[in-house]
């Protein structure tokens, strides 16, 4: 059965409305094991015929059968499979991958057939050694002579068996000696049973073949016909496809890293865009989360289980509402379910003096349960009790700021101070509380019994506000409703008070801070987007620069998905490396910012989000260049410089 059979094959190239037919009704039969030379002058159509024979191109019309199968009906992947398993190409200009060693160039066809690394390393090394290149296995093409490069090309053609060797002007770029060595190799391969199809314009080279076919102006003008091979035909066992998704990905990643090393400066600039984007996202979100946590902590320090009742109708102005909340209201609230403590509060600015030191501060008249209601511990001494309230005792508890201002590091407990010229004895010092979210120093205060303060300091019985602590925070809304109902009933149905829920305040502030954090993250994400555009730009440049390499890989059996996968993974490798470095830089930047007393919160989600976005950026922005590479025409790609 014929190995190759062409019948009425034509090939027409179109450029807009202009059509040029370069092959006219080619009829050709080649038997297994033949050494055929196709000879013709430049422009005769011999290279176009070789491209069709090697499944790099398709005929415009006519029939092409390989071992009885209609090749014209094959899709691109089936043609790639046929090239990978059957054909080996030897090109005039060698077509070696510049950034790969001799061994790596030879291994390319085996990569796409799924041959395990150890096995293909051994086979490539053996082939190169048999061709006299055993000491130049790790040399790159620019370190080899023309004859040595052509021998590497022949070794590559034999890597997957090379049942059919297509040699396009294999001696055209060589000196006489190197050309003779290449022809000796081709004759030896023919003797070993390989089918050799030699394309040349030199008659003396063609005469070394067993059969000479002459082509002129796209037509075969001389062909003595097939010459059956004498003797037994060698056994070219069918290849077993050993490819797997994992091995494909690993090989694509190796190729990607090699490509990045070949253009290290450009790769670094591309990485920089991703690094800046990822680092900005992580640092910005850490700052935003830190600011949110700081505000929430400050509000929480005032109590998360608190309800605050203030006098005055909500959303109304111009009314005298200062006397609408009284002590009996607080006593009634204490009897409601889920109320842990309810304390009255009055306050005013006072001058407190000890010896020669005086200090302007806020005096807060409150109840004995204040520390329970506000969960504010005593640092030294004690807080006043119910007996002090009943007896109108002139006792006070100092905040940390006041104690420091009047007594320095000395212990003020038991000492006497003048508050607006009234003598008070210091019972204790409150624990540090810090500033409110609005910047007010909570430690710049003194506490006195409500009865004493209202009578001797403020001269009024109505309250500035009442603080209510609930036992079960989950039921705080129900408790708020009960307080509202109670006070409205006590005030004759008039809503002349306001109730503020600290849990709601925290929730509202958290939502606001979350919005600001998202805004910060969005601004930072724009940097990542710009980095992604940089990845796409560089990958498009890479595809353009490596067009010939893509053609070489297609000629040696790479399918569309292999090329797509290779360039997509290359983009992902760039993005992943940039993501990893960006995470480190982002965390480092956050740590530096934290050293300047800026609140920072480290958490895994922003890191994972930033890295995931970087990875997704590589996937999205790498797809278009990868798709462009995968859709290249092998013949056009090989012809690219």
From Swiss-Prot:
UniProt-annotated binding residues for ATP: 40-47
Pfam family membership, one: FtsX
Localisation per UniProt entry: Cell inner membrane
Transmembrane segments: 267-287, 516-536, 573-593, 604-624
Residue span(s) of domain ABC transporter: 4-242
Record-annotated disulphide pairs: none
Entries under PROSITE patterns matching the protein: ABC_TRANSPORTER_1, ABC_TRANSPORTER_2, MACB
GO biological process: response to antibiotic
Keyword terms: Antibiotic resistance, ATP-binding, Cell inner membrane, Cell membrane, Membrane, Nucleotide-binding, Translocase, Transmembrane, Transmembrane helix, Transport
A GO MF term: transmembrane transporter activity
Subcellular location, principal: membrane
Topology with respect to the bilayer: Multi-pass membrane protein
CC per GO annotation: plasma membrane
E.C. code: 7.6.2.-
Family that this chain belongs to: Belongs to the ABC transporter superfamily. Macrolide exporter (TC 3.A.1.122) family.
Complex formation: Homodimer.
Function of the protein: Non-canonical ABC transporter that contains transmembrane domains (TMD), which form a pore in the inner membrane, and an ATP-binding domain (NBD), which is responsible for energy generation. Confers resistance against macrolides.
Name this protein carries in UniProt: Macrolide export ATP-binding/permease protein MacB
